[in-house]
Regions:
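Polytopic alpha-helical membrane-helix bundles and their juxtamembrane interface segments
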Residues: 1-177
Length: 177
């Protein structure tokens, strides 16, 4: 990887977008669409990292983007049929599609990405709970709230630890530039 596409830069962009997304979704609870869009950027950064880490012999073929696009379009159609297609919901579907792809991709990358795979899997469980919270009865909201944070906090800790380990491995020392 070149300096322009170093894992350190990719992870820093993802972490900044995560903090900004958390700010809009959790702290202020305003601009929810922007917050979800920022998490789409996070997943895009992780997808870029996975692409750059792929062996040159095993770079994704055209079938991989086709599968992701097909899943995304299918979920959009489901939203349309349910009369729930909004920009916010479309971004949420994009986010969960990207996250699901990244999660499955990391599990296939071997032991060196295990920590990242576990972090993304917990992140996926968190997002599933967020989705369930929006459709479950009000009485279940507190349980979903607890589950969301029970999955989310460990996911972010594992992802940050993994990113720091990558920065040390690739640079010899931890530097942000």
């Amino acid at each position: 990887m070149t300096n322009e596409t170093s894992p350190c830069h990719i992870f820093i962009i993802a972490w900044v977008c995560t903090l900004a997304g958390d700010y809009f979704l959790s702290v202020t609870q305003t601009h929810l669409t922007l917050g979800i869009g920022l998490f789409c950027v996070v997943q895009t950064m992780y997808m870029l990292y996975l692409f750059l880490c792929s062996d040159t012999d095993k770079k994704p073929t055209l079938s991989e983007p086709a599968v992701r696009i097909a899943l995304f379009v299918f979920l959009l159609v489901v939203l349309l049929v349910m009369n729930m297609l909004t920009l916010q919901n479309a971004l949420a579907v994009l986010d969960i599609s990207l996250l699901g792809y990244n999660m499955f991709k990391t599990w296939g990358q071997g032991k060196e990405m295990r920590l990242f795979a576990i972090g993304l899997s917990l992140f996926f469980c968190c997002d599933i709970c967020v989705g369930l919270r929006s459709i479950l009865p009000q009485e279940m909201c507190m349980i979903m709230f607890i589950l969301i944070w029970s999955f989310y906090l460990p996911s972010q800790i594992l992802i940050v630890i993994y990113g720091i380990r990558v920065a040390f491995r690739d640079r010899g020392t931890f530097r942000l530039s």
